[in-house]
Regions:
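A generic structural signal for short, non-catalytic loop/turn and secondary-structure boundary residues
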Residues: 2-3, 48, 82, 135, ...
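Non-heme Fe(II)/2-oxoglutarate
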Residues: 1-72
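Catalytic core of Fe(II)/2-oxoglutarate
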Residues: 112-191
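Extracellular structured ligand-interaction cores
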Residues: 5-9, 71, 82-88, 95, ...
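Catalytic core of non-heme Fe(II) oxygenases with the double-stranded beta-helix
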Residues: 63-139
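Short beta-strand-to-loop capping motifs
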Residues: 14, 91, 162-166
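Secondary-structure boundary elements
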Residues: 46, 92-96, 167
Length: 191
C-alpha cells in the first residue's frame, strides 16, 4: 500500500451516471445533492454527505494561455491550504490530467477568485514546481486544499465535483487524513 498526498483512484460498487446539464455560455454550474439521490444515499452509508456540488466544463486547449496569461489557473479550492478532499467524476476525460504543485522556496500564493467565483488562493506557474499528476479518467478522491490545475484537455470535458462532509457535521469538510478511513474499501492503492 502506497499512501498518496494528492489523489486516490476509486473502485466503486456503482457507475456514476448523471446527465450533463446545459451550461449555456458558462464553464461552471452548481447543483445539489437532491440532483444525485442515489449517490447521496451511498455516501450516507459511509457516514458522509455532500456539502457542495459543482460541474465544470473545460474545452480543448485548456488552459488557453492567450486568455489566462493575466490570470493564474493554479489554485486551491478555498482561501487556505487545508488538505480538504473532494470526489470527482469526469466525463470525456481524454488526455486531461490534474496536476498538483508546491511553491518554490520564497514564493507565495495570493488571494484570488476562482472561475467559479468563489474565494481561492492562486499561484503563478513560474513560482511553482510540479509535485504530482494523475489522469482524470476514473472516479477519484482529490486533495483540493493544495495547489492544483487541470492540464492537457483535448476534448470537451465535464467534471462532477463533490465536496464531502461528515454526516453528523454537514457544514464541516472531510480532510485528506480521513479519506483512507471513509473510503478504505474502495481506494485503489498504487504500487
Amino acid at each position: 500500500m502506497k499512501p498518496n498526498d494528492y489523489y486516490y483512484y476509486l473502485n466503486l460498487p456503482f457507475e456514476f451516471n448523471k446527465e450533463v446539464p446545459d451550461f449555456g455560455d458558462k464553464g461552471h454550474i452548481l447543483f445539489s445533492k437532491q440532483d444525485v439521490p442515489k449517490f447521496e444515499a451511498w455516501l450516507n452509508t459511509l457516514g458522509l454527505t455532500i456539502r457542495h456540488a459543482d460541474v465544470f466544463r473545460k474545452k480543448p486547449g485548456w488552459p488557453d494561455t492567450r486568455f489566462y496569461k493575466e490570470r493564474a489557473t493554479i489554485h486551491i479550492d478555498g482561501h487556505k491550504f487545508d488538505n480538504h478532499a473532494k470526489i470527482n467524476f469526469v466525463y470525456n476525460s481524454g488526455t486531461s490530467k490534474i496536476v498538483w504543485y508546491k511553491l518554490k522556496e520564497g514564493r507565495e500564493s495570493f488571494p484570488d477568485q476562482s472561475g467559479a467565483y468563489t474565494p481561492s488562493r492562486s499561484a503563478w506557474l513560474e513560482d511553482c514546481v510540479v509535485a504530482e499528476s494523475a489522469f482524470t479518467n476514473r472516479p477519484m478522491l482529490v486533495n483540493v486544499g493544495q495547489l492544483h490545475d487541470i492540464q492537457d484537455v483535448d476534448q470537451i470535458r465535464y467534471c462532477f465535483s463533490f465536496q464531502l462532509a461528515p454526516l453528523n457535521n454537514p457544514t464541516d469538510k472531510i480532510y485528506w487524513s480521513d479519506v483512507t478511513i471513509y473510503f478504505k474499501d474502495y481506494i485503489e492503492y498504487q504500487t
